[in-house]
UniProtKB/Swiss-Prot annotation:
Residues 41-55 are annotated as: Acidic. InterPro entries: Herpes_US9. One of its GO terms (biological process) is intracellular transport of virus. The lineage of its organism: Viruses, Duplodnaviria, Heunggongvirae, Peploviricota, Herviviricetes. This is Envelope protein US9. It comes from Varicella-zoster virus (strain Oka vaccine). It holds the Pfam family Herpes_US9. Phosphorylated on serines within the acidic cluster, possibly by host CK2. Phosphorylation determines whether endocytosed viral US9 traffics to the trans-Golgi network or recycles to the cell membrane. The modification Phosphoserine is found at residues 46, 48.
């Protein structure tokens, strides 16, 4: 659980340190409003020279998704092991008591 909080903290810290580097535009032009048809500017991070915000978030999302499935697999495995252990214990207890009764 602590590792997940650390990773989320790092992801938030990297997002907070994002540096927006717009495409080169002439100095004499001013942008009054972003047109809806115009594609959004790409956002790059100071840590990486070629990783955009979308790529970064996709990478972090895949990592979080992988951890979620790994935990889910571990929980299901533990439940199955517990059920088999209890079933084995019940059969063993039945066998032992049958030795004394019968």
């Amino acid at each position: 659980m602590a590792g997940q909080n650390t990773m989320e903290g790092e992801a938030v810290a990297l997002l907070m340190e994002a540096v927006v580097t717009p495409r080169a535009q002439p100095n004499n032009t001013t942008i009054t409003a972003i047109q809806p048809s115009r594609s959004a500017e790409k956002c790059y991070y100071s840590d990486s020279e070629n990783e955009t915000a979308d790529e970064f978030l996709r990478r972090i999302g895949k990592y979080q998704h992988k951890i979620y499935h790994r935990k889910k697999f571990c929980y299901i495995t533990l439940i199955i092991v517990f059920v088999f252990a209890m079933t084995g214990a019940a059969f063993a207890l039945g066998y032992i008591t049958s030795q004394f009764v019968g």
